[in-house]
Amino acid sequence: MTTYYAHSAQDELGNLLPYEHWQTLQSHLVNVGEMAAEFARVFGAQEIACQTGKLHDLGKYSEAFDRRLHGGPSVDHATAGAKISVERWGNVIGKLMAFCIAGHHAGLANGNGEGDNRHTLKDRLALQFGADIPALDNLWQQEIKLPQNLSAPPLKPDAHHPFFSYAFF
């Protein structure tokens, strides 16, 4: 079975250290999920935050990212988790999560319109696994457990403009 890593480790001269010094991807995603949940507990969104944290680096479950850890080219590793969140939890909760996941390195992108040379979330969600972004190893589904359903965030959206309220979430 393949072990995927979130981060490599280097010595003071920049040489890669042995794998036992590297952080496994499963450990990283679970830990980030737990930390995000703690931060979001104060406003009642701990479950959404936990799952967002678990998905933020999901694209690292790929051969392309493993090559990156060994000096290969950069790899889009955030879009995968954004896509999975929308596929699993839909266009409200999943899309709120997708903005966070897709923007966790580059900042938040616009939803549909043109922005500052960043791809929109709509464009990124349209990317295809194995063609536009790296295919994921199915191992992720064994290592990262996701609930089937998530409750809506504890907001009281405006009846006429509900997404305006969600934008502040």
Language-model features, listed with the residues they occupy:
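Accessory nucleic-acid engagement/destabilization modules that flank
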Residues: 1-169
